Design a protein with these regions (language model features):
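Extracytosolic ligand-binding ectodomains
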Residues: 1-240
């Protein structure tokens, strides 16, 4: 967003905290790559406590140093802790981004701090993608909400799980066998479109056929897809 407004990204300062697990450390590695690319300064680089119940030490540093961006990755419990303590400590930052917003239901439990939060996601319900089994992305989203009305915002992991079933079905059919190696080879050769997006695996096993996305939580608790920097509400201003 800074670059799109003619500002120097190198002047943006980052404060971040991550759970000490494979997923979150992968996220951290990605942040480090982007920060290096744009010469952005990381002023806080913390590990969340093992029980994910308290990140006040990080937030105290954040209030003192006043970085432009706060990043947190700690699965659902970490997201809930972050949203709760951001609200308790009245953290103001131009950008706040945390993983697992939907699964933690931060928009319902902590609406004040959730307002303006950026939430990375693997999937959007308005993607122009479809398949023969679940239909379009929006159809899958509507069907899921009918079956599980407790979800006001559908976590992308649920869509991911449905897509995984389609991948296995396709691989088993192409392998025409339950032999482990043949099925593995068929999975590795996957190249298909689903309601979740295109799926094709790199040798390392990650899906290289689709990008990541962001959604931003509004004051009404809705999740707005961020397709371009212009879609983003910036800076975030929470009303505590």
């Amino acid at each position: 967003r800074a670059k799109s407004e003619g500002k120097d990204p190198a002047k943006m300062r980052i404060g971040m905290a991550f759970e000490n697990d494979g997923f979150s450390l992968d996220v951290r590695a990605g942040v480090l790559d982007v920060a290096k690319k744009y010469n952005m300064k990381i002023v806080i680089d913390d590990k969340l406590p093992a029980d994910l119940s308290d990140m006040s030490a990080t937030l105290t540093k954040f209030k003192a140093l006043k970085p432009d961006i706060l990043l947190v990755s700690g699965h659902s419990k970490g997201a809930a802790t972050a949203a709760r303590q951001i609200e308790e400590m009245k953290i103001q930052a131009p950008v706040v981004a945390i993983t697992h917003c939907e699964a933690a239901k931060v928009h319902e439990k902590f609406p004040k701090s959730a307002n303006g939060m950026m939430c990375p996601t693997q999937w959007l319900s308005n993607l122009p993608k479809k398949d023969a089994y679940f239909g379009t992305a929006s159809q899958w989203n509507e069907d899921f909400k009918k079956l599980h009305p407790s979800y006001s915002a559908v976590p992308y992991q649920t869509a991911q799980a449905s897509a995984a079933v389609l991948v296995f079905k396709d691989a088993f059919e192409r392998a025409n066998s339950f032999d482990q190696k043949q099925v593995r080879d068929a999975l590795a050769a996957t190249n298909m479109e689903t309601f979740y997006g295109d799926i094709k695996f790199a040798p390392e096993g990650n899906n290289i056929a689709k990008p990541m996305f962001y959604r931003q939580i509004g004051a009404d608790g809705s999740y707005k897809p961020i397709v371009s920097p212009a879609d983003m509400t910036f800076p975030r201003k929470a009303n505590y």
